[in-house]
């Protein structure tokens, strides 16, 4: 699959390096992860570089990593190797977003007018070659040999091209300085104000916890160590109000890139190294005796650097992403198939909370429903039992009254005695005042039909008189027994 063409100057630089290393298959991965800054790859430490390799999927292929490292070294030492033009990529398609304020593209003036007024401007104002190439095309072919090919470096990245001819990296628009090499001190290696302020805050917090140094011990040490005394002895003799004292402290407190170190020319300090140097300088300003204890100074400076680098880079990245409305090429890429895990966790938490509330509501309603069901069952059971008990009592009472009135011996037992002999659940209170239903019906009929009352009542009484005799008269039968055996 062919890699996408670069659209910005940073992407073009990355494209050239990957093309040189035959690693164009990683171009899209670098762009997706915001890796269009080649300078970041060159200045990255070992851990940061390995992390970048893991992000683009190159960490598992060490041979590819070695080829990329070699291409980066060649890009720093010999940028002319990366000046091959892209035939399918027009120069006008590369936006210039790092031009200085005095450049003709920024000011909106023509190249010819800018050339006429260039003598009145800053003589060393420099712009990338892509802008210079456009200007040369409008001026004619007479000056086309001055500009070689498309530049790979912008003004902010010019420090990586020190010691090389300007035709290889960038051109000066001043006619007097065409072809002059870049100055080694073109960009000062120093932290910005925000990072320096963060270092100062950390030093202020740490200073009270440091042990106080004895000035007499420092003087004794300088007396015994003549070399050290010759180097930094004059700093202890300066007054605190001396404006040159801090400058001398910064000169001799530097951990990385000190004036007497054997650092390779062209290799610049990274952010970590600059932070360590700044922390060491501010610590020595607080306590000059730390100049004589570089091991302790280095440990303290590294501790401050770790804290400052993390906080400052996090704050800077967050502020830049918050202030920009347009899409940044260095923003963290979020895959479509992998949504943000925080949103997923929030959704799961809300679902779990809704489920817990629903279960709590069901648990609170469940006892009420169970009690209602139990009460309904008990009520129905009790009503059914009461109904059965009432029916049994009524039938027993009617049977007793009928048997007493129509007894064959004509004897009526006392109601109170009969009630006393019966169990409590079978006793019928006020049995004397209660009449069977058929007696009430007979009374009503006799009142309504007096002519037929006698015959009807006599028939009814005959039936009632015959019923008890047949129901309760027990005929005694003698059971014949066999004689006993005399044997």
Swiss-Prot record:
<feature type="modified residue" description="Phosphoserine">
    <location>
        <position position="183"/>
    </location>
</feature>
<feature type="compositionally biased region" description="Polar residues">
    <location>
        <begin position="409"/>
        <end position="418"/>
    </location>
</feature>
<dbReference type="GO" id="GO:0001958">
    <property type="term" value="P:endochondral ossification"/>
</dbReference>
<feature type="modified residue" description="Phosphoserine">
    <location>
        <position position="172"/>
    </location>
</feature>
<feature type="cross-link" description="Glycyl lysine isopeptide (Lys-Gly) (interchain with G-Cter in SUMO2)">
    <location>
        <position position="369"/>
    </location>
</feature>
<feature type="cross-link" description="Glycyl lysine isopeptide (Lys-Gly) (interchain with G-Cter in SUMO2); alternate">
    <location>
        <position position="333"/>
    </location>
</feature>
<feature type="cross-link" description="Glycyl lysine isopeptide (Lys-Gly) (interchain with G-Cter in SUMO2)">
    <location>
        <position position="126"/>
    </location>
</feature>
<dbReference type="GO" id="GO:0005634">
    <property type="term" value="C:nucleus"/>
</dbReference>
<feature type="region of interest" description="Disordered">
    <location>
        <begin position="162"/>
        <end position="188"/>
    </location>
</feature>
<keyword id="KW-1017">Isopeptide bond</keyword>
<dbReference type="InterPro" id="IPR039040">
    <property type="entry name" value="NAB_fam"/>
</dbReference>
<feature type="modified residue" description="Phosphoserine">
    <location>
        <position position="328"/>
    </location>
</feature>
<dbReference type="Pfam" id="PF04902">
    <property type="entry name" value="Nab1"/>
</dbReference>
<dbReference type="Pfam" id="PF04905">
    <property type="entry name" value="NCD2"/>
</dbReference>
<comment type="similarity">
    <text>Belongs to the NAB family.</text>
</comment>
<dbReference type="GO" id="GO:0045892">
    <property type="term" value="P:negative regulation of DNA-templated transcription"/>
</dbReference>
<keyword id="KW-0805">Transcription regulation</keyword>
<feature type="cross-link" description="Glycyl lysine isopeptide (Lys-Gly) (interchain with G-Cter in SUMO1); alternate">
    <location>
        <position position="333"/>
    </location>
</feature>
<comment type="function">
    <text>Acts as a transcriptional repressor for zinc finger transcription factors EGR1 and EGR2.</text>
</comment>
<dbReference type="GO" id="GO:0014037">
    <property type="term" value="P:Schwann cell differentiation"/>
</dbReference>
<dbReference type="GO" id="GO:0042552">
    <property type="term" value="P:myelination"/>
</dbReference>
<dbReference type="GO" id="GO:0006355">
    <property type="term" value="P:regulation of DNA-templated transcription"/>
</dbReference>
<dbReference type="GO" id="GO:0045682">
    <property type="term" value="P:regulation of epidermis development"/>
</dbReference>
<dbReference type="InterPro" id="IPR006988">
    <property type="entry name" value="Nab_N"/>
</dbReference>
<dbReference type="InterPro" id="IPR006986">
    <property type="entry name" value="Nab1_C"/>
</dbReference>
<dbReference type="Pfam" id="PF04904">
    <property type="entry name" value="SAM_NCD1"/>
</dbReference>
<dbReference type="InterPro" id="IPR006989">
    <property type="entry name" value="NAB_co-repressor_dom"/>
</dbReference>
<feature type="cross-link" description="Glycyl lysine isopeptide (Lys-Gly) (interchain with G-Cter in SUMO2)">
    <location>
        <position position="465"/>
    </location>
</feature>
<feature type="cross-link" description="Glycyl lysine isopeptide (Lys-Gly) (interchain with G-Cter in SUMO2)">
    <location>
        <position position="143"/>
    </location>
</feature>
<feature type="cross-link" description="Glycyl lysine isopeptide (Lys-Gly) (interchain with G-Cter in SUMO2)">
    <location>
        <position position="477"/>
    </location>
</feature>
<feature type="region of interest" description="Disordered">
    <location>
        <begin position="399"/>
        <end position="434"/>
    </location>
</feature>
<feature type="region of interest" description="Necessary for nuclear localization">
    <location>
        <begin position="307"/>
        <end position="338"/>
    </location>
</feature>
<dbReference type="InterPro" id="IPR038398">
    <property type="entry name" value="NCD2_sf"/>
</dbReference>
<dbReference type="GO" id="GO:0003712">
    <property type="term" value="F:transcription coregulator activity"/>
</dbReference>
<keyword id="KW-0804">Transcription</keyword>
<feature type="cross-link" description="Glycyl lysine isopeptide (Lys-Gly) (interchain with G-Cter in SUMO1); alternate">
    <location>
        <position position="480"/>
    </location>
</feature>
<keyword id="KW-0539">Nucleus</keyword>
<feature type="cross-link" description="Glycyl lysine isopeptide (Lys-Gly) (interchain with G-Cter in SUMO2)">
    <location>
        <position position="129"/>
    </location>
</feature>
<feature type="cross-link" description="Glycyl lysine isopeptide (Lys-Gly) (interchain with G-Cter in SUMO2)">
    <location>
        <position position="454"/>
    </location>
</feature>
<keyword id="KW-0597">Phosphoprotein</keyword>
<keyword id="KW-0832">Ubl conjugation</keyword>
<feature type="cross-link" description="Glycyl lysine isopeptide (Lys-Gly) (interchain with G-Cter in SUMO2)">
    <location>
        <position position="355"/>
    </location>
</feature>
């Amino acid at each position: 699959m062919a890699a996408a063409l670069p659209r910005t100057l940073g992407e073009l630089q990355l494209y050239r390096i990957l093309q040189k290393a035959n690693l164009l298959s990683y171009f899209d991965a670098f762009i997706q992860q915001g890796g269009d800054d080649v300078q970041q790859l060159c200045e990255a430490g070992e851990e940061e570089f390995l992390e970048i390799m893991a992000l683009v999927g190159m960490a598992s292929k060490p041979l590819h990593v070695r080829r990329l490292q070699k291409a980066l070294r060649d890009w720093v030492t010999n940028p002319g190797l990366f000046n091959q033009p892209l035939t399918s990529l027009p120069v006008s398609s590369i936006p210039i977003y790092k031009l200085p304020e005095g450049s003709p593209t920024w000011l909106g003036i023509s190249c010819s007018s800018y050339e006429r007024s260039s003598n009145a401007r800053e003589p060393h104002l420099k712009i990338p070659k892509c802008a210079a190439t456009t200007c040369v095309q409008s001026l004619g072919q007479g000056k086309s040999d001055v500009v070689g090919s498309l530049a790979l470096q912008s003004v902010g990245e010019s420090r990586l091209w020190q010691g090389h001819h300007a035709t290889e990296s960038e051109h000066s628009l001043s006619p007097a300085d065409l072809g002059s090499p870049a100055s080694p001190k073109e960009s000062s290696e120093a932290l910005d104000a925000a990072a320096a302020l963060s270092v100062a805050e950390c030093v202020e917090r740490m200073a009270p916890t440091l042990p106080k140094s004895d000035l007499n011990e420092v003087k004794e040490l300088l007396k015994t160590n003549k070399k050290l005394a010759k180097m930094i002895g004059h700093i202890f003799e300066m007054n605190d109000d001396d404006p040159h004292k801090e400058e001398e402290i910064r000169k001799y407190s530097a951990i990385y890139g000190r004036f007497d170190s054997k650092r390779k020319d062209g290799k610049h300090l990274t952010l970590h190294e600059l932070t360590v140097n700044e922390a060491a300088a501010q610590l020595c300003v607080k306590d000059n005796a730390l100049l004589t204890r570089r091991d302790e100074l280095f440990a303290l400076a590294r501790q401050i650097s770790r804290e400052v680098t993390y906080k400052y880079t996090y704050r800077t990245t967050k502020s830049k992403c918050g202030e920009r409305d347009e899409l940044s090429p260095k923003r963290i890429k979020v895959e479509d198939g992998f949504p943000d895990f925080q949103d997923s966790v929030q959704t799961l938490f809300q679902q779990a909370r809704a489920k817990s509330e629903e279960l709590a509501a069901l648990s609170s309603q469940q006892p009420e429903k169970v009690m209602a069901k139990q009460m309904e069952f008990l009520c129905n059971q009790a009503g059914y039992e009461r109904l059965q008990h009432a029916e049994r009592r009524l039938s027993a009472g009617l049977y007793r009254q009928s048997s007493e009135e129509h007894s064959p011996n004509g004897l009526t037992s006392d109601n109170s005695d009969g009630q006393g002999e019966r169990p409590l659940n079978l006793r019928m209170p006020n049995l004397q005042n209660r009449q069977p239903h058929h007696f009430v019906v007979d009374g009503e009929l006799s009142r309504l039909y007096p002519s037929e009352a006698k015959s009807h009542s006599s028939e009814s009484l005959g039936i009632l008189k015959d019923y008890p005799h047949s129901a309760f008269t027990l005929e005694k039968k003698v059971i014949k027994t066999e004689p006993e055996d005399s044997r």
